[in-house]
Regions:
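Basic, Lys/Arg- and aromatic-enriched nucleic-acid-binding interface segment
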Residues: 3-9, 19, 23-78, 82, ...
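Key DNA-contacting residues within the recognition helix of helix-turn-helix
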Residues: 4, 11, 82, 169, ...
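C-terminal flanking helix
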Residues: 11-14, 18, 201, 205
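Basic, alpha-helical nucleic-acid-contacting "clamp/cap" segments
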Residues: 51-59, 90-137, 149, 204
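Short, basic (Lys/Arg/His-rich) helix/loop patches that form interaction surfaces
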Residues: 54-64, 74, 111, 125-133, ...
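Short, polar N-cap/turn motifs at the start of nucleic acid-interacting alpha helices
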Residues: 88-95, 157, 176-196, 218-225
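Catalytic-site neighborhood detector that most strongly recognizes the C-terminal catalytic loop/helix
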Residues: 98, 102-106, 118, 185-210
């Protein structure tokens, strides 16, 4: 994937130079792109997702829970949630509005707040409509401690975008609408969604429904896979 991205960046630079008259041709276009092999990222199991939420609720007086829930139930990227402020979250309209300077792609995105997420965000109370960051001070360290204490993914380590992958996989499993999911994820085409984000291994219609309806139910009530 790094070779693929490297060629793409180089081609963009050469195209810019070509338009400015700094070179005669884009030599990168003469080289076929290397085959892109996407690494399959396993979505969290239902038990793991709930275990992570409950750990976030239990530690640091629950101040990390909203950010955790936004990544898990709205597919907000880690980079985006660090910049997100409470006044970008509108529980009345049911939308999280991400500004262009906060997103990975540089475009604005509006993500639906589903009931399971709304129930968690409502607990923030007085924080609504404020310009304060959703993530508390010293977020990175606290988030690492929460992941460590949750006990999930110990063997293979934490994957940066695993909550976004989990969101996408459970969303499609339960709602079955690829076009809607593509819009929520902010993808221009379905190709990235289908080739990189979706991993339905171990996800059933039952666990898909439970993911979206059993927000803070104790993980002990669920079967650990």
């Amino acid at each position: 994937r790094q070779r693929y991205k490297g060629r793409l960046i180089l081609s963009g630079i050469l195209n810019f130079s070509l338009k400015r008259g700094w070179c005669r041709k884009n030599a990168a276009s003469l080289v076929p792109p290397p085959p892109l092999k996407e690494t399959r990222i396993r979505a969290l199991s239902l038990y793991e997702a709930k275990q992570l939420l409950h750990t976030a609720k239990r530690m640091f007086s629950g101040e990390c829970l909203p950010a955790c829930a936004l990544m898990l139930y709205a597919g907000i990227r880690p980079y985006e949630v660090r910049r997100l402020t409470w006044n970008r979250i509108n529980l009345k309209s049911g939308l999280v509005s991400l500004a262009p300077n906060h997103t990975k792609t540089g475009g604005s995105r509006h993500v639906s707040i589903l009931p399971v997420l709304a129930a968690i965000l409502n607990q923030a109370g007085s924080m609504h409509n404020s310009g304060k960051l959703v993530c508390p001070p010293n977020w990175e360290k606290k988030w690492r401690d929460i992941r460590r204490q949750s006990g999930i993914l110990r063997k293979k380590g934490w994957v940066q975008d695993v909550l976004r992958h989990t969101y996408a996989s459970y969303h499609l499993a339960h709602f079955g609408n690829c076009s809607l999911l593509q819009k929520e994820m902010g993808h221009a085409t379905p190709s990235l969604l289908l080739t990189r984000y979706l991993n339905m291994d171990g996800i059933t219609p039952i666990t898909g429904a439970m993911f979206w309806t059993h927000g803070l139910n104790p993980p002990s009530l669920l079967l650990q896979d």
